[in-house]
Amino acid sequence: GQRAAKATRQSGDVAVGDTYVFRYPTDADAAILLRIADREVVAFSQKCTHLGCVVYFEAEEDRWHCPCHEGNFEPRTGEVISGPPPRALGRIDVEIRDDTIWALGYQP
């Protein structure tokens, strides 16, 4: 995948259970991260793999959700749970370093 490191946010700005929308790997690519635990974050392309609608996190259902055609994805892996999407969400490698959340690469 593409490997350009980019600081996305101070980790203190994103509470556990919250999401943050950013742009990666380019300024035209919407991405979203979820802070699962104090030192655990995951991030994905915000574009559904079905027809490209915007996905968001549904905390009460513990899933990524696409409202266009009811596609649902597993929160940690981005794998398809249900609906028409043909494959998992594009995954962004993220990690917390020195209280900054870094995006380190993208796997479509």
Label every model-predicted segment:
Residues L33, N72-F73:
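Hydrophobic beta-strand positions
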Residues D62-E70, V80-G90:
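Short cysteine/histidine-rich metal-coordination sites, predominantly Zn2+-binding motifs
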Residues H50, H69, R76:
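Short glycine/serine/threonine-biased micro-segments
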Residues V42, G71-N72:
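A residue-level detector for well-ordered beta-strand positions
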Residues G1-A59, R87-P108:
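N-terminal pre-ligand scaffold of iron-sulfur
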Residues Y56-A59, E74-G78:
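Short Cys/His-rich "knuckle" micro-motifs
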Residues F73-E74, V94:
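Active-site and channel-lining beta-strand-loop segments
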